[in-house]
Amino acid sequence: MGHCLTKNQQDKDESDHHVDFAGANVTVITTKESWDQKLSEASRDGKIVVVNFSATWCGPCRMMAPFYRELSEKYPSLMFLVVDVDELIDFSTSWDIKATPTFFFLKDGQQVDKLVGANKPELQKKVIAASDLVPHVQN
C-alpha cells in the first residue's frame, strides 16, 4: 500500500493535469459548487458517493486511477468522484486529508467509510460493501 503526503509536494508538471483521473463513470470535481451539485444529485438518487482525494503528481494515485475507473464502470449504482487536492486546497483541508489517495464513502453527504492509501483489494472490498447498501432498481 502506498500513499503520498500532501505537505511538501514535489515539483508539479501541469502538462499531465488530470491525466488518467477522469473517464468512465468518474467525475472530476473542480469547484465547491460542482461538489454540492453532485452530492445533491446522489442524495436525490439514493446513491452512495465514493470520493477519491488525489493528486496528479502522486505515484500511488496515478497507479490507482485505472482501477478506480474500472470500479466506476462495474458499480454504476455508486457515484465516483475525484478531487484534486492541489486544485481545491481549502476544500481538501476541510476533509482533513493528510495523504493521497484518500477515499471517502458518503451517504446523504455523511461519511460512512474511509480508506487511506493505494490498497486495491481493500478499496474493492469497500466498494462492494457500499454497492450492497444501494437498492438496485431495474430500468
Positions of PLM-derived features:
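N-terminal leader/targeting and pre-domain segments
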Residues: 1-47, 122-139
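Intrinsic disorder
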Residues: 23-29, 55, 74, 82, ...
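Acidic, Ser/Thr-rich intrinsically disordered and amphipathic helical segments
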Residues: 34, 63-70, 110, 122-125
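Short cysteine clusters
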Residues: 58-61
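Non-catalytic, surface beta->alpha helical segment in thiol-disulfide oxidoreductase systems
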Residues: 98-139
